[in-house]
UniProtKB/Swiss-Prot annotation:
Gene that produces this protein: egsA
Subcellular location: Cytoplasm
Role according to the record: Catalyzes the NAD(P)H-dependent reduction of dihydroxyacetonephosphate (DHAP or glycerone phosphate) to glycerol 1-phosphate (G1P). The G1P thus generated is used as the glycerophosphate backbone of phospholipids in the cellular membranes of Archaea.
Protein name: Glycerol-1-phosphate dehydrogenase [NAD(P)+]
Source superkingdom: Archaea
Lineage of the species this protein comes from: Archaea, Thermoproteota, Thermoprotei, Sulfolobales, Sulfolobaceae
Length: 351
């Protein structure tokens, strides 16, 4: 099969470990980044992490700080304007998913290097060259800048709220069904499929399953495993040149819920819930996935997230239309109401 050329841009440096923010200055010197920097962060992270753990290591560099509160188009445009006005040469994203998305999208828009400094392991966006920016019509990921380097301090990540950590596990479990959907699209539609990239994504999912076995006993060890899984998943997307290895029917379901109920459930929670049902359709051992989720406290029912049963069914019936060009197990026509209800009930997502 003839494959269209795509350029694979991967992180050149990945720093991970306990307490490594103490080496922040050394990392910046090693990377030899052009200045001035634009540090993009959130209000809480600025106060609790940047001011206390990073600022002293960056004081000899030229930099500006901008605080963001949301990941939407208006916020992204505001940050882009600031970056252009200040003549910014390098973008540093210090925060969770919202901050990282804005940072790498800004870096992409102004064509600058991006350094990812995650403070919560809530999804695989810490590494991937894609960002979830609201206000673009549909809640899907768009092209962004891949990180030149990732600085992931496991001590900081392990101190994130447990719900965010669980969401990261949930997002990573979704690779189980995403890769199956990718294989299906290759078989039925002739879509490009990369064995190595798919294997990398599946390895991330296996790491997430391993994480569910240890994280209740040892949060640091569990988060270390999760962080490696999230990084691997992001790298898989970079190699594929798309989100295909990491996003399939389970993500389409999550995006459908996000459209119907914008403020209910974290992204990773919704992906995990979708993974249970899509695994059922694929004939994968969905009970194992559900047990792993339940063990760590991830929601396994619509009631736990606050979504009405009919909302789950509705999301299942419209999920295929979120990205019509992305073929999945849901097919071109999607699920009927009756089929969707049967799937949701038999997997225990609704009662």
């Amino acid at each position: 099969m003839e494959i269209k050329e795509h350029i694979i841009n991967l992180p050149k440096h990945i720093y991970t470990g306990y307490g490594i923010l103490d080496n922040f200055r050394n990392y910046l010197q090693t990377l030899n980044l052009p200045q001035p920097f634009l540090v993009i962060t959130g209000p809480v992270i600025h106060q609790e992490i940047f001011s206390k753990r990073i600022e002293e290591h960056i004081k000899d560099f030229k930099y500006e700080v901008v605080i963001v509160n949301k990941s939407d188009l208006s916020e992204a445009e505001k940050v882009e304007d600031i970056a252009r006005q200040k003549g910014i040469k390098t973008i540093l994203g210090v925060g969770g998913g919202t901050v990282i998305d804005i940072a790498k999208f800004t870096a992409y828009k102004i064509d600058r290097e991006f350094i990812s400094i995650p403070t919560s392991p809530s999804h695989d966006g810490i590494t991937s060259p894609f960002a979830a920016i609201k206000g673009l019509g549909k809640p899907i990921s768009i092209k962004a800048k891949e990180p030149l380097a990732i600085i992931s301090d496991v001590e900081i990540l392990a101190s994130a709220p447990r719900r965010l950590i669980n969401a990261g596990i949930g997002d990573t479990l979704g690779k189980i069904t995403a890769v199956r959907d990718w294989r299906l699209a290759h078989k039925l539609r002739g879509e490009y499929y990369g064995d190595y990239t798919a294997s990398l994504a599946l390895m991330s999912a296996r790491h997430a399953l391993s994480c569910t076995k240890i994280i209740n006993k040892d949060i640091r060890a569990g988060v270390r495993v999760l962080t490696e899984a999230l990084i691997s998943s992001g790298v898989a997307m970079g190699m594929a040149g798309s989100t295909r290895p990491a996003s399939g029917s389970e993500h389409l379901f999550a995006h459908a819920i996000e459209l119907l109920y914008p403020n209910l459930g974290l992204h990773g929670e919704l992906v995990a819930l979708g993974t249970i049902m899509m695994a059922y359709i694929h004939g994968i051992n969905w009970r194992r996935i559900r047990r792993a989720m339940k063990k760590i406290g991830l929601p396994v029912t619509s009631k736990q997230i606050g979504i009405p049963d009919e909302g789950i069914i509705k999301a299942l019936t419209i999920a295929h239309s979120i990205r019509p060009e992305r073929y999945t197990i849901l097919g071109d026509r999607g699920l009927t109401w009756e089929s969707a209800e049967k799937i949701a009930r038999e997997t225990g997502v609704i009662s």
